[in-house]
Curated annotation (Swiss-Prot):
Pfam families: AadA_C (PF13427), NTP_transf_2 (PF01909). It is an enzyme of class 2 (transferase). This is Aminoglycoside (3'') (9) adenylyltransferase. InterPro entries: AadA/Aad9, AadA_C, NT_sf, Polymerase_NTP_transf_dom. The lineage of its organism: Bacteria, Pseudomonadati, Pseudomonadota, Gammaproteobacteria, Enterobacterales. One of its GO terms (biological process) is response to antibiotic.
Amino acid sequence: MREAVIAKVSTQLSEVVGVIERHLEPTLLAVHLYGSAVDGGLKPHSDIDLLVTVTVRLDETTRRALINDLLETSASPGESEILRAVEVTIVVHDDIIPWRYPAKRELQFGEWQRNDILAGIFEPATIDIDLAILLTKAREHSVALVGPAAEELFDPVPEQDLFEALNETLTLWNSPPDWAGDERNVVLTLSRIWYSAVTGKIAPKDVAADWAMERLPAQYQPVILEARQAYLGQEDRLASRADQLEEFVHYVKGEITKVVGK
């Protein structure tokens, strides 16, 4: 199953890895494919997720050239018949090994940055709490396209650090403007956080949605059902459930907080 999914995006994947190798090869330690491509299967709007590990920081010339070339290998969901959205996260080996929280991210590329990149705005290296979640994902489910397996290269992320990252993520969503235009993703992400808080594991979005559905009061189930169906390619109508959506967000945040604290 996993090999078949990867085969469907092999051409694009080869192009992306080729760009990475061309710009980073002297310092490149590893490239790991993680996310939907290797866990649960690519859905209509799924990204191709890559974690790249290098030995040294990127100079500004390399950063800009790499990002500009990655832009040519990626497309926003629904805008291309042959290209998927690509998300590339780059870390420096000594910033994450040995593990410490929060860890530093050297670079991240994604379609949400396209307009900024075209305007000449490039995100610098930064502390990223999400690396605790990302590295947990990579250690659980990934394929090494370059270098050793993720579970061999990366230290395990302690559960308390994973919980801290999950808890910090909850602060992003407090009122409707925080999820306007991104309703589906927020609903599914909250379901995944809830799943991870309870189980200590990372699940595909649709699997986490099914898990959450079984635990939700009946009045919130239509919200997650709409999000799941939209994720699988049906029409996204979540914006029409504004009141239910707000109640859902606050309910699930409350359930997560019971587990992870604060």
